[in-house]
């Protein structure tokens, strides 16, 4: 009981520390965030690579604000695994995000080095490198002026894209019942191009780097049910601090359910089922607390996760939620 109380206190203190972050000014940079980020922590922290004793392959799709034309649509495929007999994890992911005529596609390779500690505690230090393609599809612009001839010099008559590198860093500390992560998955700012010039579409501004802090605990309700509260905060020095709180419950028969709330005043319901401890499927429904937004601000998300058994490694890293 004392151990579980210590875990709860650690989680509360971490959450309060995170909420004390203060920032100013809104940033124009968009951030992709899945409703149930626990389905793919690799997307926000490269140190999560190889944090399970098995290889994990994940696929997810998120459709935001279903009642609004040009609303964000995101998809991701990722895989990560530990290397046998080495304190190393590797991973890779490819994702896409579409908002109106703006398209972003990214590919990243991940590496994590694990420092094993007593009592199954692990500190992972991660790095990722990849390429991000930004595209503006001017060909999809629809005009409602019958006199428009398409000769407006301010609107290009062709799609414009640019590809540039990006890098990320992260740290991930875990125990069998607690985890705490800190990361900056994109150290550079890949901007949408106005012209085909690589040098003008990549920047480094420390104040615009988005930092992520996530923490969670695993609590035994009884011999069959576990609760997993977790919190995620993300911000740059030039933006406000956003947070998301998730509370999920899981049963030993593979069923899971829960909900979440995020600072932009959105709530969600999460459900899932795991087949034979290998294949898992989850669905999330999100909506706004604002009555004026409820009709067209609903979002849907689905994830598939598949676990592939590996040869037992001498290096352990517990699995969370």
Where are these regions (language model features)?
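Bacterial Sec-dependent N-terminal signal peptides
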Residues: 1-31, 247, 308-310, 320-321
């Amino acid at each position: 009981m004392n151990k579980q109380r210590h875990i709860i206190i650690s989680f509360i203190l971490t959450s309060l520390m995170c909420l004390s972050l203060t920032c100013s000014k809104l940033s124009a940079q968009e951030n992709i965030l899945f409703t149930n980020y626990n389905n793919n922590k690799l997307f926000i922290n490269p140190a999560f690579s190889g944090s399970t004793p098995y290889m994990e392959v994940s696929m997810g799709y998120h459709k935001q604000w279903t009642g609004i034309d040009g609303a964000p649509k995101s998809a991701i495929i990722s895989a990560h695994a530990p290397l046998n007999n080495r304190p190393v994890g590797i991973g890779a992911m490819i994702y896409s995000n579409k908002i109106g005529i703006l398209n972003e596609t990214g590919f990243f390779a991940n590496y994590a080095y694990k420092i094993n500690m007593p009592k199954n505690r692990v500190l992972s230090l991660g790095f990722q490198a990849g390429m991000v393609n930004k595209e503006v599809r001017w060909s999809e612009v629809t005009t409602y002026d019958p006199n428009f001839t398409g000769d407006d010099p301010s609107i290009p008559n062709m799609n414009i894209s640019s590809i540039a590198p990006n890098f990320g860093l992260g740290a991930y500390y875990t125990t069998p019942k607690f985890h705490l992560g800190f990361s900056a998955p994109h150290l550079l700012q890949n901007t949408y191009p106005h012209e085909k010039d690589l040098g003008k579409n990549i920047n480094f501004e420390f104040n615009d780097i988005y930092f992520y802090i996530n923490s969670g605990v695993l609590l035994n309700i009884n011999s069959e049910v576990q609760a997993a509260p977790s919190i995620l905060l993300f911000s740059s020095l030039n933006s406000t601090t956003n947070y998301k709180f998730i509370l999920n419950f899981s049963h030993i028969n593979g069923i899971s359910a829960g909900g979440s709330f995020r600072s932009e005043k959105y709530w969600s319901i999460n459900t899932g089922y795991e087949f034979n401890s290998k294949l898992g499927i989850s669905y999330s429904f999100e909506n706004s607390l604002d009555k004026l937004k409820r009709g067209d601000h609903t979002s849907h998300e689905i994830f598939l996760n598949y676990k592939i058994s590996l040869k037992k490694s001498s290096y352990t890293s517990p699995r969370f939620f």
